[in-house]
Each structure stands twice: as structure tokens, then as C-alpha cells.
Amino acid sequence: AVVLVGYGIILPDGSHLLGEDVLNGAMILILVTCVVSSFVTESTARKMLLQRKASADMPAVPADAPDRLLLAINNPDTIVPLVNLTLMLRTPKSVVPPLALHVVLEGDPSALQAGHDQLQKVEKMAAAANVEIETFNRWSVNVVSGISHTVKENAISDLIIGLHQKQKLSESFYGKLGADLLGAVERQLLIYRPIIPLNTVRRLHLVVPGKAEFEPGFTQWMHRVGLLAQQISCSVEVYSTAPTLTSIERQWERQKQTVIALYHEYHSWNDLLPLAHNVRLEHMAIFVCARRGTISFHSYMDRLPNQVERCFSQRNLLFIYPSQPATESTAKAGLRTGLPINVK
């Protein structure tokens, strides 16, 4: 405003009190400060949030904490490995039975019987393991709506689905269902791709992004991974930044979970090939991911699906998207529904 006033003052010789160079410089200064201030504000807000969360001790997950696991099934070929994973992730002595869901589209009533048969198979497997399980054959206008409503109605803590099996090159890694669920469900989402039976896995490779310890779902997914390692009696190799590795080790001690773990400082997120060389056929890779706009989200996660597809084609895979309540992450729906994947 001052520059514009000065530019509008005409001197006796006909020139402006403040010339065009000053006016252009002021405009450039305003542009630069507006751009820089937005990045500085975001960076400062993140640092303040990290400092506040770092000052508070992370609570341990009680051994008797109620489980509210929901297994969403659709493919009859993956029922057995998905049920086995669900049973192994269930906290011992939990009084809350896991749930199994099959969604029937309103325009496809013929799928009702197929869903009933699949749920019966789930019940038989759970009964053989002496575990009670509740099953639902639910009508809905679409699969995502049916699953998300079930999650909310039953206060689900963990949603388990199978990884999409690509039929065309144009399809995305997670598939339309997985991508839509990431935006619709705020609870912890586990996406599993089985290659070999889970009880034959000899080692877990856990890949964790830096600053994951500051996310609200940190203790929850650590509890699940610890349970899985105990159930199949295998060791865990953890890959992350040094501060996050320290937090992971302390958290397992706090939760009093006996986990045999080796910790590796790892920064080569843009190239997972060195890590893939360590993951043998009898091993399983677990990737802890993050939704866009959260503290632990990094730009390399946009390329993660393509790298995993190229480097881990014949390995058991488990992708974990930690619980991220809207009140903790952001009030903007655009950030909550942003997906760290390449949807084609």
C-alpha cells in the first residue's frame, strides 16, 4: 500500500516518487514471503506437534485389551490365509470375538449364497482353532460403504483385507477397493498378500517410516506385529531411522512382549532392492505405511507400491496403515482421503 501511494505521487518533473522498479520489487517481495511463509508455518506446526508428543510417554497396550478385528472376505481362494492371519493377530484370552464380513451388492443377489458358503468356511476354521467368530452377510449399494459402515457400527479397531490381484496392467497395486477403503476407513487397515502358509514363515522384515512413533496408532500396530512374531515363533528385523528404532525397541519392552528383534538403520527408501535381497522366500515383509498429510508420510510412499511389486513379487507381504482418527490427523477431508498410491 505504501509503495502504491508513493507510485501515485507525481513529482514536478513528471516522474513518480517511487518508480516502477520499486513497485515490481515490492510485488516480488510479497510473492516470495507468501510462498515461503506457508512452508515455514507447516514445518513449525509439525515440529511443535512432535515436541508435544515426545514429551508424553506412549501408553502400553494392555495384554487383555479388547480386540475388534474385522475380516472382509470376497475371494474364496484367500479365505484360509486371511483367517489364519486374523486368528494370529487376535490378542490371547480376548473376550471380544473377531468378525467376518461378506458384502452382497443390491444388484447382485446371486452372490448371497456364495457369501454364505464362504462365511461357513470361516466359521469352521475358527471352530477348529477353538475361537468364536461372528459372521455377517451384509447388503449394500457398494462394497466400500458396506465395510465402512460395519467398521463404525461395531467400533472395529483393525480391518483386514486381502491384496488386490491385478488382472490388467492398468489396474493399481491396491485395486479400487483398497484405495477407496484407505480414504473411507480411519481405523487400522491391514492388507495381506499370502504366498506361503503363515506358519511356515521363518522371519519378519518390518519396514517403518521415520517419525512413525509420533502417530496415534503406533502402539496398536506394534502390538499386532509383536503378537504375530510370537504366534509363529520367528524373529523380526526392523528397518527405520535411528530415533524410530529406539522408540520401537522401548515400546516392545514397555508392552512386555518377548520379541527377538534385530534393528537396522535404513534410509534407502527410493530403492528397496538392497532390502529385497535380505527377504528370502520363507520370509515375510511388513511395510508400515502412512496416509497422506500425516506426520510420518514421506514422498517416497507414492513410489512404494511400484517398488514392492518389482522387488517382492514372490514374498508374503503385509501392509499396515495405522489408525488415524480425523481429530488427530486433520479436519480437512481432502487430506484424510489423499492416498499414497498411484491410482491409474
Descriptions of predicted regions:
Residues 30-49, 154-197, 277-344:
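Gly/Ser-rich helix-loop-strand patches that form or flank binding pockets
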Residues 1, 13, 119-123:
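N-terminal secretory/membrane-targeting helices
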Residues 59-278, 286-289, 293, 321:
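Structured cytosolic domains appended to multi-pass membrane proteins
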Residues 2-44:
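Structural signal for the N-terminal portions of transmembrane helices
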Residues 14, 54-55, 174:
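Short secondary-structure boundary micro-motifs
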